[in-house]
């Protein structure tokens, strides 16, 4: 029995006490002057109702004598004095209540600002991508983000809610003292127990149940929200209507909403019966007993009119404090849930080891590679996967050479880029730069030598200049250099025609904003990489750079690219074999290993895997020359093809 009680106490401490103590520790983020001022306001709001009960009770007790003595008498003056005090206290409450709300809102913004900053810091803390590519970590991040962004359950609301309890529980203690003064102290104790039982039935276990349910059903809510957004988003409307999906999406939205709410309804019925009704019945019986004893005492003449009025008001006021506190209860409970979600996300990110810092953090990687980059006996497996991506990979990239890496999906092409950029670290072997392990350089120093554009490159809803200049964030954006990078990608006519030229935000959601076609976005992303090369990056990495282009546009594109990247160390990743024939050297990956290495002509002459796949793709194009043409840019208003 003792062990069971100890376990329950530990569980209660973990669920109710520890999170509240943590919330209190966050109050300094709001600033101590604000904390003390809001605390004093809450103390006043706790004491003033008690004083009001005393003043009105005295007022009631003086009515008979004042009525008998008449106006102008000392008794009438005492009655008026009690009325003035009660009125002043009432007015003070009315003035302090909006002040409490205003100061509480200010505290919420300040504390929430700290936690939003912390969420961003945790999400961006890792130098690699491993934590953010893990499904459970992603789910934890989405849960924390969702709970931090919802208006009524943020840590800031929890912080202001914790201070709001000062007013509520201060008033409860004051009213209990009044009950003890006019009656007996066991009456006061019974009133306190009854009120807290009422509180537990109204809020305690019930509110914790809501938080647990809310957290457990997060996946269902995300599915519901996905179908809602799918139905409301303009970008998805065309295809949904063409394929007749609108009715299906509406049904899925309703089904997912019902699926999310059904467990909530069941739990609500259970808690309403076993918690709310039983605890409420006990509280009403206990307070009814106190009220009956109070009236009986007054009937025997042992309690006067003032004492009876004070006792009745204090007892009824106390039981009313057993209700739900809108300014504190949900705010605190859900706010603690938001903090717990953020802590869970933090723990999951921290579970991934960071790369060991460079022995000399001041060492520079500028000018590297001068000779080679070598993947030396590299092995790598994604977390949770059973098959390694690389197992003994040995590949050398020569400085100043354009090397293309081709292979079927799953061959490890994109993973090669991630290892080169140190977004992941090899499980075995090493990436050597001019013979030195890349881990000898600080991560940021090495990445400044890389200009990488991934297949799923970022489309920043910012100006054209920002979208290009982000290639070298440490360099002040120079208009001439930005225009030069755009010009190398033949973008100047299209960009100059935008409403605000290079200052145009690339989103139609903004005033004078505009959007680009898929091919234009791809060229803009490569212009970002070329801007980085102009700023000093030595290695240009292009992962599927022509995914949004048709074959004819692709051929013209690579002719241009060959000119603007001449002399740079270039790594080109592609699944289209026709797009890499202009490379100085072609490497074929299969199952994480290099199986062929040579020029386009030599690999065709060898008749190996490259020749086989190249001819398969060539035969497809010869059979249907338009099979790979992409004409999406022609039908979008305001978009033009520029190649």
Describe the role of every protein-language-model region.
Residues 36-99, 169, 173-207, 285-306:
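Transmembrane helix-loop-helix hairpins at lipid-water interfaces of multipass membrane proteins
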Residues 492-524, 528-545, 549, 624-629, ...:
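ABC-fold ATPase nucleotide-binding domain signature/coupling loops
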Residues 1-49, 73, 77-81, 100, ...:
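Membrane-integrated ABC transporters
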Residues 457-510, 531-538, 609-612:
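Conserved "ABC signature" C-loop
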Residues 559, 567, 576, 581-643:
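C-terminal portion of ABC ATPase nucleotide-binding domains
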Residues 1-21, 109-156, 220-263, 336-347, ...:
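Extended non-transmembrane interhelical loops and adjacent amphipathic helices
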Residues 311-348:
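Cytosolic ends of transmembrane helices, especially the final helix of ABC transmembrane type-1 domains
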Residues 29, 145-158, 232, 241-285, ...:
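An intracellular "coupling" helix at the cytosolic face of ABC transporter transmembrane type-1 domains
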């Amino acid at each position: 029995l003792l062990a069971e009680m100890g376990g329950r106490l530990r569980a209660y401490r973990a669920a109710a006490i520890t999170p509240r103590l943590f919330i209190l520790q966050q109050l300094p983020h709001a600033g101590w002057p604000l904390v003390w001022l809001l605390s004093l306001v809450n103390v006043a709001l706790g004491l003033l109702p008690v004083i009001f009960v005393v003043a009105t009770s005295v007022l009631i007790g003086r009515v008979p004598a004042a009525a008998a003595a008449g106006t102008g008498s000392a008794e009438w003056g005492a009655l008026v004095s009690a009325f003035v005090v009660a009125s002043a206290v009432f007015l003070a409450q009315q003035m302090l209540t909006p002040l409490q709300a205003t100061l509480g809102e200010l505290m919420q913004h300040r504390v929430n600002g700290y936690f939003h900053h912390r969420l961003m810091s945790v999400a961006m803390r890792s130098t690699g991508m491993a934590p953010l590519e893990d499904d459970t970590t992603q789910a934890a991040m989405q849960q924390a983000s969702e709970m931090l962004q919802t208006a009524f359950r943020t840590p800031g609301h929890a912080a202001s809610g914790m201070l709001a309890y000062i007013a509520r529980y201060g008033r409860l203690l004051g009213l209990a003292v009044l009950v003890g003064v006019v009656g007996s102290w066991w009456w006061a104790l019974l009133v306190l127990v009854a009120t807290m039982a009422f509180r537990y039935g109204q809020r305690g276990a019930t509110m914790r149940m809501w938080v647990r349910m809310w957290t457990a059903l997060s996946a269902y809510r995300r599915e519901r929200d996905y179908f809602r957004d799918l139905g409301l988003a303009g970008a998805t409307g065309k295809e949904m209507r063409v394929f007749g999906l609108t009715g299906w999406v509406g049904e899925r939205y309703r089904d997912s909403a019902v699926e999310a709410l059904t467990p909530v309804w069941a739990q609500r019925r259970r808690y309403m019966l076993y918690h709310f009704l039983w605890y409420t019945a006990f509280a009403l019986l206990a307070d009814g007993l106190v009220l009956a004893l109070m009236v009986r005492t007054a009937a025997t003449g042992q309690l006067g009119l003032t004492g009876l009025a004070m006792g009745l008001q204090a007892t009824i006021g106390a039981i009313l404090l057993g209700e739900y506190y809108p300014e504190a209860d949900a705010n605190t409970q859900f706010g603690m849930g938001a903090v717990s979600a953020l802590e869970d996300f933090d723990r999951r990110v921290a579970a991934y080891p960071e790369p060991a810092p460079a022995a000399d953090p001041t060492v520079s990687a500028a000018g590297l590679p001068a000779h080679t980059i070598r993947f030396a006996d590299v092995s790598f497996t994604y977390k949770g996967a059973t098959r390694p991506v690389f197992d003994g990979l040995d590949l050398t990239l020569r400085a100043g050479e354009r090397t293309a890496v081709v292979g079927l999906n799953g061959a490890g092409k994109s993973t090669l880029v991630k290892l080169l950029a140190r977004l992941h670290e090899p499980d075995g072997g090493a990436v050597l730069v001019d013979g030195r392990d890349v881990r000898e350089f600080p991560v940021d120093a090495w990445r400044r030598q890389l200009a990488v554009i991934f297949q799923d490159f970022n489309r920043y809803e910012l100006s054209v200049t920002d979208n290009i200049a982000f290639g070298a964030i440490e360099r002040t954006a120079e208009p001439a250099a930005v225009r030069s990078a755009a010009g190398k990608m033949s973008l100047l006519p299209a960009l100059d025609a935008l409403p605000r030229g290079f200052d145009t935000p690339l989103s139609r959601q903004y005033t004078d904003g505009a959007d680009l076609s898929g091919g234009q976005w791809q060229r803009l992303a490569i212009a970002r990489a070329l801007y980085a090369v102009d700023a000093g990056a030595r290695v240009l990495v292009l992962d599927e750079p022509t995914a949004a282009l048709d074959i004819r546009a692709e051929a013209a594109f690579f002719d241009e690219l060959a000119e603007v990247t001449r002399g740079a160390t270039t790594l080109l990743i592609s699944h289209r074999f026709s797009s890499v024939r202009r490379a100085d050297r072609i490497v074929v990956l299969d199952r994480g290993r290099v199986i062929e290495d040579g020029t386009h002509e030599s690999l065709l002459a060898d008749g190996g895997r490259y020749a086989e796949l190249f001819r398969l793709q060539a035969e497809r194009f010869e059979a249907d020359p338009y099979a790979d043409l992409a004409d999406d840019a022609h039908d979008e208003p305001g978009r033009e093809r520029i190649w």
